[in-house]
């Protein structure tokens, strides 16, 4: 067992939290969900166990996601969630100090939102906290050489936000963050199934539909799955069959929003860097980058080769882990980079 404090890299996502422990790799991979007894304030479950309680809890128990669109929406619950996950990450160490932590944040977050993340991590047990932009962490985790003058583009499509960035010489040249990502696709499925089929489904079921038959580019074969929900009129259980071609139509609008944003960032980028990107290609990371046809859609839209990184779910966490080597020469707070921020409200 180690006798010193662990340095941790944290992908604090809207849908999932991944924690990288120096020398060990990713040691925590849990949904960003907390279940709490409202009467006592006691945390009952965190992570996968809490996620399984969504929509199934008695009146005194609430299962919730304390982050929304990439930022903290419930400070107290975020602190309690991080306390449990930090404890899980360092349980194999006889640490004498609290850990130093690098946490990713979406591009273009405000100083207030940055401070909220830092405060939550400190209250959860971190000794020092450093922030890194998600696309920079994603690029590091995907193995891109961003130290050279040659430009690279990363599109990180997570649960709460899509972050698009052009990187060069260890910095972010142009970046954008929009709240159109995995959760928006899930919500679109929920609305469609209720409106068209008169069946009410929950977020867990919607995510299963997205993963199994969801697509943002036409499939050569129309695949299907059987879904069980509650009839909106009778309240009774009801099964229905959904097809990928149907979900493709549901996904058209949010997919277009993401493609529009990628194109917009390219238009804000210098011609020299755009030339580099055309040569190097666009790298996709994040869980929702694995939506069937996302790479094809963006390639058709931009005319640039697009590829999904290896283990795209973990790229940001691994990037935070690589950035741990920087913190001995840094001051606490955001990792300062020369960058041009673009924030859009979609």
PLM segments and residue spans:
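Nucleotide/phosphate-binding catalytic cleft detector across ATP-hydrolyzing
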Residues: 1-157, 165-282, 289-346
């Amino acid at each position: 067992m180690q006798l010193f404090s662990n340095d941790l890299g944290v992908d604090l996502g809207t849908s999932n939290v991944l924690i990288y422990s120096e020398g060990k790799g990713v040691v925590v991979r849990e949904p960003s969900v907390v279940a709490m007894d409202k009467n006592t304030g006691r945390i009952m479950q965190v992570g996968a166990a809490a996620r399984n309680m969504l929509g199934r809890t008695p009146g005194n128990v609430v299962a919730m996601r304390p982050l929304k669109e990439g930022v903290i929406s419930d400070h107290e619950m975020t602190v309690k969630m991080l306390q449990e996950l930090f404890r899980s990450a360092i349980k194999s160490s006889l640490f004498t100090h609290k850990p130093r932590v690098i946490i990713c944040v979406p591009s273009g977050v405000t100083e207030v939102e940055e401070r909220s993340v830092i405060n939550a991590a400190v209250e959860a047990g971190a000794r020092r906290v450093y922030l890194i932009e998600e696309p920079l962490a994603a690029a590091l985790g995907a193995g891109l050489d961003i130290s050279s003058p040659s430009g690279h583009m990363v599109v990180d499509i997570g649960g709460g936000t899509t972050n698009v960035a052009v990187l060069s010489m260890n910095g972010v040249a142009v970046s954008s963050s929009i709240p159109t990502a995995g959760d928006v696709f899930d919500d679109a499925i929920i609305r469609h199934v209720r409106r068209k089929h008169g069946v009410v489904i929950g977020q867990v079921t919607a995510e299963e539909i997205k993963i199994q038959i969801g697509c943002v580019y036409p499939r050569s074969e129309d695949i299907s799955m059987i879904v069980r929900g509650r009839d909106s009129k009778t309240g009774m259980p009801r099964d229905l069959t959904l097809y990928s071609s149907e979900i493709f139509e549901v996904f058209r609008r949010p997919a277009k929003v993401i493609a529009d944003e990628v194109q917009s960032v390219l238009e804000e980028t210098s011609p020299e860097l755009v030339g580099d990107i055309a040569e190097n290609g666009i790298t996709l990371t994040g869980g929702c980058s694995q939506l069937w046809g996302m790479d094809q859609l963006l390639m058709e839209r931009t005319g640039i080769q697009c590829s999904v990184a290896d283990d795209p779910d973990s790229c940001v966490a691994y990037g935070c882990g690589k950035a741990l080597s920087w913190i001995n020469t840094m001051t606490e707070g955001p990792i300062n980079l020369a960058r041009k921020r673009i924030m859009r409200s979609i």
